[in-house]
Curated annotation (Swiss-Prot):
One of its GO terms (biological process) is translation. CDD domains: Ribosomal_L16_L10e. This is Large ribosomal subunit protein uL16c. One of its GO terms (molecular function) is structural constituent of ribosome. The gene is rpl16. Part of the 50S ribosomal subunit.
Length: 143
């Protein structure tokens, strides 16, 4: 599972998911990306499940880039505890994803294989996504 090696602070505020992604919304590394259409938190387990699905379908062909990293700690209080007594302890890590953010990029495989692999990975995500090609940025297909 992905998680930061060290952080300046152990706990964070919740924040908000308003607006669209201004960073990480252009194709940088691969040829076929998977782009988010909704705002959400994506856990490190979901990112890993998507990565496994893509690499297993591509069968060691091509190269995969993961464009998001879970750097936000989510805290959970123990069950049946009374109010007060501070914030809970960090349980897992999430990546904050806004609409337009690119989640994965793949290259070195055909478009059909990339589309099918990204479709399998899209089922693992808690949000709606779309598959984009570099040649046809105008006609985007929602997955």
């Amino acid at each position: 599972m992905l998680s930061p090696k060290r952080t300046k602070f152990r706990k964070q505020h919740c924040g908000n998911l308003k607006g669209i992604s201004t960073r990480g919304n252009v194709i940088c590394f691969g040829k076929f990306p998977l782009q988010a259409l909704e705002p959400s938190w994506i856990t490190s387990r979901q990112i890993e499940a998507g990565r496994r699905a893509i690499t297993r379908y591509a069968r060691r062909g091509g190269k995969l880039w993961i464009r998001i990293f879970p750097d936000k700690p989510i805290t959970i209080r123990p069950a049946e505890t009374r109010m007060g007594s501070g914030k809970g302890s960090p349980e897992y890590w999430v990546a904050v994803v806004k609409p337009g953010k690119i989640l994965y990029e793949i290259s070195g495989v055909s478009e059909n294989i990339a589309r099918a692999a990204m479709k399998i990975a899209a089922y693992k995500m808690p949000i709606r996504t779309q598959f984009i090609t570099t040649s046809s940025l105008n006609k985007k297909q929602e997955i």
